[in-house]
């Protein structure tokens, strides 16, 4: 059974409860997104980023607290990132308006006189909750004009299984809408063609696979299983430990794929997010940690090539998508993509109606495909 991709994408956008501009983007608001690496912010310096087509200025206060503000002065629109930051307040370079970095509240307008009755404290620059975690500045992107909930869950944290481990971060941009990036990330059938190599898998190694999936809150899980026998790293790990190798893969809204691999006392944990930048641009932010005897430099060589292969494929796909072709999703290999669109549409619908979200999976299911 096949379904048009366009209709699934449109269903997700049409259900959005916010402004027309927001619904047209197909983005999911009121979630945490990684804006940039922690290393990009130094001392009292400022850094800029864009999430969901919102320009941001980010930094740390003198006491080390991360903050994120809309990079636009509410007075005349000049980017606040051109201003001066003293560790507590951010001063606009145009008229000297000052804003408290962690709240966005205006604290000074130099042009006001004793005759003016303007209540400065009622003016706010755009501000978003911000946390540092796993080497990223995470920003909670609440929808335009909406009030923040009284409590917000903490930003996502990479799962680790020992006190000592190695960790590394990688990123690459994809010239596509975030939906295309996400369904590409979860696609199980492209490996032997896009990622074929002597150390991963070869084209002739394609064989039928059976995987069990189960629903989880806001997502789905590929249940713990023995990983692909046609992938050399897994075979090497089992040979080294003498223990079975199991892997568990989760996807949760809005854009997070995690994978945990265990074999005896050894483990590998990774998270990939497809971060929406603009309607035509997204970014894979990848972080991995492990206690294997694998140097970071060696892992990065292979991981960079792996991500570059995905990036090159998405660049080629973007050429075809310029002409708005009719696309389709098939069973069973594309079923995870269908679940993603179902999750997205149902989450947006629950926001609009106030009703509980209906999960597109009624229960555990077994899928079959060849890869």
Regions found by a protein language model. Give the residues of each.
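Rieske [2Fe-2S] iron-sulfur-binding domain
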Residues: 2-11, 15, 20-24, 34-161, ...
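C-terminal catalytic domain of Rieske-type non-heme iron oxygenases
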Residues: 65, 148-371
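Short, isolated positions within intrinsically disordered regulatory regions of eukaryotic proteins
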Residues: 33-36, 101, 142, 202-204, ...
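Non-catalytic accessory segments flanking enzyme active sites
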Residues: 28-29
């Amino acid at each position: 059974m096949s379904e048009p991709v366009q209709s699934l994408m449109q269903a997700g956008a049409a259900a959005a409860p916010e402004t027309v501009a927001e619904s047209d983007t197909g983005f999911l608001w009121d979630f945490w997104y990684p804006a940039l690496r922690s290393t990009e912010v130094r001392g009292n310096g400022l850094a800029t980023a864009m999430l969901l087509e919102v320009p941001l200025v980010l930094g740390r206060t003198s006491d080390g607290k991360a903050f994120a503000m809309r990079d636009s002065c509410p007075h005349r629109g000049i980017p606040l990132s051109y201003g001066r930051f003293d560790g507590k307040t951010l001063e606009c370079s145009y008229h000297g308006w000052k804003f408290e970095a962690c709240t966005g509240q205006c604290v000074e307008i130099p042009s006001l006189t004793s005759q003016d009755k303007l209540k400065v404290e009622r003016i706010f620059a755009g501000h978003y909750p911000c946390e540092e975690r796993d080497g990223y500045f995470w920003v909670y992107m609440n929808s335009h004009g909406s009030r923040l909930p009284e409590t917000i869950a903490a930003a996502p944290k990479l799962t680790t299984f020992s006190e000592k481990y190695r960790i590394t971060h990688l990123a690459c941009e994809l010239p596509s809408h975030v939906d295309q990036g996400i369904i590409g990330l979860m696609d199980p059938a492209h490996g032997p063609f896009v990622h074929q190599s002597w150390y991963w898998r070869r084209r002739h190694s394609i064989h039928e696979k059976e995987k069990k999936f189960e629903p989880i809150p806001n997502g789905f899980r590929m249940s713990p299983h023995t990983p692909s026998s046609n992938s050399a790293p897994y075979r090497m790990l089992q040979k080294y430990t003498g223990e079975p190798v199991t892997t568990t893969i989760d996807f949760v809204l809005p854009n997070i794929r995690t994978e945990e691999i265990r074999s005896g006392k050894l483990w590998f944990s990774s998270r990939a997010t497809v971060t929406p930048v603009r309607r035509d641009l997204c970014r894979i932010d990848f972080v991995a940690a492990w206690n294997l005897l694998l140097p970071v430099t060696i892992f990065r060589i292979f991981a960079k090539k792996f991500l570059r292969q995905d990036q090159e494929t998405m660049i080629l796909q973007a050429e075809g998508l310029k002409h708005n072709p009719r696309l389709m999703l098939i069973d069973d290999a594309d079923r995870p993509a269908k679940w993603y669109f179902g999750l997205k549409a149902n989450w947006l619908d629950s926001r609009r109606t106030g009703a509980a979200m209906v999960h597109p999976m009624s229960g555990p299911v077994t899928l079959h495909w060849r890869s």
